[in-house]
Amino acid sequence: MKKKWLAAALAGILLAAAVLSGCASTEKAKRLRFGVAGEGGIYREFGERFAALENETDNGQVELKATAGSAANLRLLTGEYLQLAIAQADLVQDAYDQTGIFADEEEDRGFGAVAALYTETCQVVVRADSDIRSIEDLHGRTVSIGAEESGSEQNALQILSAYGLNDKMVSMVNLNYEDAAAQLKAGRVDAIFMTVGAPSPVLTALAGECDIRLLKVDGAAAQRLMSAYSAYNTVTLPAGTYPGQTEEVQTVGVKAVLLASSALPAKQVQQLTQLLFSSREGLEEQLGIPLDPEENAVEGVGIPFHAGAAAYYKAAGITVDQTAGN
């Protein structure tokens, strides 16, 4: 009898351990590290608000990870440290195709698109009392090109190159958005590049503290840029986007894309996609920028979609190229 009791007890313990182990494994699988960026950008603001929505569901608990931006997010997503990330469409395509700054990297690109979220505008800003009137005038000046490993850095280098400028002609420094704004206000840098949804809270705050002017990215240089890099499109910043801005400004922009790891189950990503679009209007109000609806969220992405996102779009009557997921 005693042996039978011990055997039964042992079996019960093993069963409980297996159940607990399974629960722990499931819990771990549902924990989602979400790569955003540092303070002052829309990536961080979007991530905070979307994570709050997701954490109210039983689909997964989101943990935000602050990074330098797009390039860093793509490397961390490829390395399976992140399960979700936001990145600029131009760098997303480079990472997926292993071109550009990702040309020498051999890792498999284990991710798919969820949605294009909004257009990020390339904004080149100087003080209003500066004698800098065009990108060409940045020759011989000190310019913040964004944080190292950020999308802004790559866009700044590409835009400067389109105007015939390089690091021998321009003194380039890597600063995050908030530090760049502070340095411009103090007169320690002559211009700052920011690729971010407009209006940017950092630039709005800066314009309230000192008068600023936005430089145009247009004409033949913009055409060269868009011919060389298909992810760029033309953007017009309306007058009044920022305090003191009395005229519209022509520039270029790229899509910000939400990405998911191939390791995430299709059902989980489908639920995330559903949450994104069912919450779109509320997110727009909180962020102060328009988010793409379903029909626009599949454009300008440049890579196939995660199987879970593809399932969501199929149910909405939209067909997309699919990769990744199970």
Role assignments for model-derived ranges:
Residues 19-22:
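C-terminal motif of bacterial Sec signal peptides marking the signal peptidase cleavage site
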Residues 104-117, 122, 241-250:
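A structural signal for short loop-to-beta-strand junctions that line the ligand-binding cleft
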Residues 24-26:
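Bacterial signal peptide processing site
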Residues 41-78, 84-85, 245-246:
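Extracytoplasmic small-molecule ligand-binding "clamshell" domains
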Residues 1-10:
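Bacterial N-terminal signal peptides that target proteins for export
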Residues 89-91, 98-102, 130, 167-258:
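Pocket-lining segment of extracytoplasmic ligand-binding domains
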Residues 175, 179, 186, 196-214, ...:
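An extracytoplasmic/periplasmic, membrane-proximal ligand-sensing/linker region
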Residues 29-62, 120-186, 299, 303-308:
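Bilobed "Venus flytrap"/periplasmic-binding protein-like clamshell domains
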